Amino acid sequence: MRILVLGIGGIGGFFGGYLQESGADITFLVRPKRKEILLKNGLNVISPLGNLKLKPNLVLSNELKPVYDIILISCKTYDLDQAILDLELAKGKGVVIPFLNGLTHLKKLDKEFGSKKVMGGVAHISSTINNQGTIEHFSEFKKLTFGNRAKTQNQILEPFLAECKKTKFDVTLSEDINLDLWKKWIFISAVAGATTLFGCSLGEIVKHNFGKKIICDLYNEGRSIAKLCGFKFEDSEVKTVLNNITAPGSPIKASMQRDVEKKSRTEHEEIFGHLIAKAQENNFDCPILTACYLRMKVYEEKFK
């Protein structure tokens, strides 16, 4: 099985790197400047799993051929249009598994690759790429979930699942990836919302009065929107999520907050804006989520 990974940052570099370490046939699609750096320094990951240093297999967009069974997309959502252009020569037999935030990317990918070839994917990880190009993994979260968005056979996903099971990260072949996509969206909206609104980790928020309550209320706003859109979360899962995101001393920051700290562009439209639009379609008021969105609009205006 030949696997192409677009994006060699905190998600693509981490999961693709551990797939390569375990023996999978992995190729990373990169830009020329990034290729020079990776050829010189290799792919480096700092992780509780154990640090990783690899010589990655690299390809430029003009060198691609339609030979890949799986294409993993892990760019920022706002870079998707360029990613689609970069993948033009790779279009063929392969299926696409995007690991992007929100849901807006699926419509674009369906149009370009065909809905039968676009799966659903969720990455649970707290990671970033630092100024030296090293991927830093911050917590125990290290899981890929993927599956078919329609009721079709998992003929290509089963072999990919087998490859993933050889690695050090966790993996699940989902029976309802559409629900899992919503779960991730609501999870990241709460974590990104809280950590950007207050500019710190979850643990720094919950140590103060009302910190835990506002994180829970933010998550429950998102959960209510999901329910109105036909996606209900199990009570036991909700309890687990709330316990995790309000754990005392948690060092977790959303990647959006790390982007803010770097004065970089963020995915607030895809994570907050689209979710608020779903709420408005259902005449649902979500004041905390709206405050998070406004916070990021002010940030965007200041640093654009």
Enumerate the predicted regions with their spans:
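Short, charged/polar "capping" segments at the starts of alpha-helices
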Residues: R34-I37, K107, N154
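Rossmann-like NAD(P)(H) cofactor-binding subdomain of soluble oxidoreductases
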Residues: L52-T134
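NAD(P)-dependent Rossmann-like dehydrogenase/reductase catalytic/cofactor-binding core
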Residues: C216-K304
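Short, well-ordered alpha-helices that flank and scaffold nucleotide-derived cofactor binding pockets
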Residues: G17, E21, L85-L89, K111, ...
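Residues at the C-termini of beta-strands that transition into short coil/loop
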Residues: V30, L49, N62, L100, ...
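NAD(P)+-binding Rossmann beta1-loop-alpha1 motif at the extreme N-terminus of oxidoreductases
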Residues: M1-N51
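Internal alpha-helical scaffold of NAD(P)-dependent oxidoreductase catalytic cores
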Residues: S22, L89-A90, E112-K117, Q132-D235
